[in-house]
């Protein structure tokens, strides 16, 4: 819509200038004004191109990373916390253990055939039918995305692991 306003505005200005220009003396002013308007339009177009180039540069990576496979051919599900600086705290709460090098571990990798999450009460096993539920719970609930609610997230994952659907397979 913003792109539509600029040409309409320019056309209005050109029409106004053309109707106001009645003598040869004002014709030079009109030409100068038209040149100035054209320069402004070029600047607007260049800035719009620069903005779109910046948006495309910051575009997210392709979804090819979701199709990672293990040596046995099973798909790997990677879970990334929203705030990577809090990764160590999240792992500490869920596992009860500290990571030796938190910068080295950028994601929790789970095999989809048997998802395993380590929890203070022991490891949680998720069957292959539960992959989508674990992914949705981890990424789409505020309990697993807000650092203050990580204990709730651990409780929800524990409850999910106890369901019939996740224990099958």
From Swiss-Prot:
Residues 45-68 are annotated as: Disordered. Disruption phenotype: Fishes show reduced dense iridophores in the light stripes of the trunk, particularly in the anterior region, resulting in irregular interruptions of melanophore stripes. Fishes lacking alkal1, alkal2a and alkal2b are embryonic lethal and display total loss of iridophores. Pfam families: ALKL1_2 (PF15129). Residues 52-67 have a biased composition (Basic and acidic residues). The keyword rRNA-binding does not apply. Keywords: Cell membrane, Cytokine, Disulfide bond, Membrane, Secreted, Signal. Expressed at high level in the notochord and iridophore stripes of the trunk, as well as in the eye and swim bladder. Homodimer. Cytokine that acts as a physiological ligand for receptor tyrosine kinases LTK and ALK. Required for neural crest cell differentiation and iridophore development during embryonic iridophore development and adult stripe development by acting as a receptor for LTK. This is ALK and LTK ligand 2a. The gene is alkal2a.
């Amino acid at each position: 819509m913003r792109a539509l306003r600029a040409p309409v505005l320019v056309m209005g200005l050109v029409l106004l200038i053309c109707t106001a220009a009645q003598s040869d003396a004002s014709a030079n002013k009109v030409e100068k004004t038209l040149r100035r308007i054209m320069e402004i339009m070029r600047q607007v177009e260049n800035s719009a191109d620069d903005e779109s180039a910046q948006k495309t540069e910051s575009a997210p990576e392709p979804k090819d990373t979701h199709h990672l496979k293990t040596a046995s051919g099973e798909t790997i599900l990677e879970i990334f916390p929203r705030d990577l600086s809090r990764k160590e705290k999240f792992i500490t709460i869920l596992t009860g253990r500290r990571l030796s090098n938190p910068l080295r571990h950028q994601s929790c990798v789970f095999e989809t055939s048997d998802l395993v999450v380590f929890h203070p009460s022991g490891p949680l096993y998720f069957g292959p039918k539960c992959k989508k539920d674990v992914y949705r719970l981890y990424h789409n609930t505020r309990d697993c995305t807000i650092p203050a609610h990580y204990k709730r997230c651990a409780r929800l994952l524990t409850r999910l692991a106890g369901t019939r659907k996740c224990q099958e397979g």
